[in-house]
């Protein structure tokens, strides 16, 4: 979690408004019990040790995903953090926990299908905005914009089920370093790469 702390701190210093870290996916439950338990222990340690600093730095913490399925101590620590930072107005730090892009799209489709079945909505009237509103970043966190830049560390060339709908026009950077070794310097390199690009949003 040291890398995460450094990146959160550096994002705040750079004036970045939104930062989302993919901490635990819906697929990660398939890992060994020991590995899953270790991830949650690290999460609880980070939240408990850095809560005061997050509050002092005006960082607001949000969770994307159903964190209530996590172990009780993790849920308790997260809920305390969410409550203690809910009125902060600086960097919004989103932690994706028990989150999956396909999972939230499926739930959005189900919710819209129910409206169609009840006669509240015609299929031809379904819009991109309606789907976006039913996603985790819409229904629960309407103020979270689509990501401009996605940084995938360790040289892996895939999104791993992360914000699939929202990342339609995101710029992607793939540093070769592993996440624990991802430094503020590497972070700034990725940002500089992004800033050198011309965003086209599918126009050409």
Stretches with model-predicted labels:
Residues 1-204:
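Flexible, compositionally biased loop and terminal segments
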């Amino acid at each position: 979690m040291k890398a995460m702390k450094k990146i959160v701190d550096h994002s705040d210093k750079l004036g970045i408004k939104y930062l989302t870290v993919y901490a635990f996916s819906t697929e990660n439950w398939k890992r060994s019990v020991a590995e899953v338990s270790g991830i949650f222990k690290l999460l609880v340690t980070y939240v408990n040790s850095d809560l005061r600093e997050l509050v002092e730095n005006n960082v607001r913490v949000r969770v994307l995903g159903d964190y209530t399925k996590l172990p009780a101590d993790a849920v308790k620590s997260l809920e305390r953090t969410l409550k203690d930072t809910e009125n902060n107005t600086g960097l919004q730090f989103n932690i994706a926990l028990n989150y999956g892009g396909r999972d939230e799209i499926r739930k959005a489709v189900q919710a819209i299908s129910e409206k169609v079945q009840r006669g509240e909505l015609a299929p031809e009237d379904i819009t991109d905005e309606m789907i976006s509103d039913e996603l985790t970043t819409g229904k629960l966190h309407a103020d979270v914009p689509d990501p401009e830049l996605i940084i995938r560390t360790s040289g892996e060339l895939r999104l791993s089920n992360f914000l699939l709908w929202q990342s339609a026009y995101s710029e992607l950077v793939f540093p070769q370093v592993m996440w624990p070794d991802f430094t503020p310097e590497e972070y700034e390199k990725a940002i500089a790469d992004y800033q050198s690009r011309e965003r086209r949003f599918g126009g050409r």
